[in-house]
């Protein structure tokens, strides 16, 4: 008896996901890499998330991407989290390894990898414009990469302060923006 699917299966779970181009892109990337993998786009309402993850685990899916509204709710169903996902409190990718579902957040990783091609962020002082999900992800990854300071500049003081508090609680040094002083 085979405990893995014949083809590796990866999925996207969210609601709404109609029109999401990820399946088109991923299937072509798998093909170009010579991988016999399939990518499924699955419309999963919040009340069915637990069952969908149990199905993902039971059917041996290789992993999945998680989008709204599941990026935070998925955490309670996982076996472990990467450091970045733990700090951000949000997951956008889940990998299944040895029956364990491991959550990751890759939203800020691409930015930092691109930045490192130009300059090493270690020791840099950074200004972050915004405090939403993308800013949160990039700020955490910059902190993990060793920046010396992150100055958060945001339209609303409370949301900016939430990001500053998150970073300070993660032992990263940040400053309020001059506008907030």
Language-model-detected regions and their locations in the chain:
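Phosphate/diphosphate ligand-binding glycine-rich loop within oxidoreductases
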Residues: 2-119
